[in-house]
Amino acid sequence: MIQPQTYVNVADNSGARKLMCIRVLDASFKQSANIGDTIIAVVKEAIPNMPLKKSDIVRAVIVRSAKGIRRPDGTIIRFDDNAAVVINKEGNPRGTRVFGPVARELREREFTKIVSLAPEVL
């Protein structure tokens, strides 16, 4: 569960290393985001000489969550860290690579480009 002020790792090569969530999108009443939800975040750590700089405001989609989610068959999938992929307004990733595994639920949420770039889908 990602809520405002939560730090998340960045799972792509867009230039950011850490993001801090400042708003959960997709619903006005929602207080927290889970896998597949879109957030607005600020870059807190960045790689030098890359397009994204510290204090840039970006959109990101959550690809891994330590809280985990329950699937319809009863299994629960959870990860070791909270991670996100930086996206543009159209929902396409800003980076060209995705690091680490991502959840299968991203395919149902129409983030097929992120799923195709990921090395492993759980």
Swiss-Prot record:
Q: Which domain of life is it from?
A: Eukaryota
Is Ribonucleoprotein one of the keywords UniProt gives this record? Answer: yes
What single Pfam family name could you report for this chain, choosing any that match?
Answer: Ribosomal_L14
Might you name a Gene Ontology BP term for this protein? translation
The answer on whether this UniProt entry bears the keyword Heme reads: no
Give the Gene3D superfamilies listed for this entry.
Answer: Ribosomal protein L14 (2.40.150.20)
Where does it localize? Answer: Plastid, Chloroplast
Q: How does it assemble?
A: Part of the 50S ribosomal subunit.
Give the protein's function: Binds to 23S rRNA.
Record-stated family: Belongs to the universal ribosomal protein uL14 family.
Q: What is the name of the protein in this document?
A: Large ribosomal subunit protein uL14c
Q: Which organism is it from?
A: Oltmannsiellopsis viridis
Q: Which gene encodes it?
A: rpl14
